[in-house]
Regions:
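S-adenosyl-L-methionine-dependent methyltransferase catalytic module, highlighting the catalytic core
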Residues: 59-66, 70-72, 76-169
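Conserved SAM-binding loop
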Residues: 2-86, 161-169
């Protein structure tokens, strides 16, 4: 089973099961990202593109350990996050304005349909788009390797984003 976490409005077609906290079309599982409803070692591949930065920095280690729990040994993790260091350096050098830096580093309000309105508790849905953790290549590498993954390949894509491919250790 291949699982995409935080699939949002455009679930990736290469994955079998799409997970999101919001009840969106084509989402099969509604769940928090740090308590997945999957059996231990039941997932063959896990993708989380622009998801982990939305988790509190106090919870990212436990979240990655939960993802490692559900993944079988040798399964691949495909993780994408903004490169906060790159964006901050662009801002300091005056290459981007404060509004753009805020968008990339802090996330937040969005006009996307998934972020309109309020949830069942009255909380604005755009809050789920706020960023609570920043990453750069070094911090991402340290965290992922600390949480049970090996064979890491971290690289920049789309200029301001990091992608990490890693294998669940045995």
């Amino acid at each position: 089973m291949k699982v995409e976490i935080g699939a949002g409005e455009k679930p990736h077609p290469d994955y079998d099961v799409h997970v999101d906290i919001l009840p969106l079309p084509d989402i099969e599982v509604i769940s928090w990202i740090d308590r997945l409803p999957f059996a231990t070692a039941s997932v063959d591949a896990l993708r989380a593109n622009h998801v982990l930065e939305h988790q509190s920095y106090e919870l990212v280690e436990g979240t990655l350990r939960e993802w490692a729990r559900v993944m079988r040994p040798g399964a691949w993790l495909d993780l994408g996050v903004p490169d906060a260091r790159f964006v901050a350096e662009q801002w300091v050098r005056g290459e981007i304005d404060t509004a753009e830096a805020n968008y990339w580093i802090l996330g937040g309000h969005s006009d996307r349909a998934a972020h309109r309105g309020v949830d069942s508790r009255g909380i604005p849905r755009w809050i789920w788009n706020a960023h609570h953790t920043m990453f750069d290549a070094g911090s991402l590498h340290a965290l992922v390797s600390h949480c049970g993954f090996t064979d890491l390949d971290i690289f920049t894509y789309d200029i301001r984003n990091l992608r990490c491919y890693a294998r669940r250790s045995s």
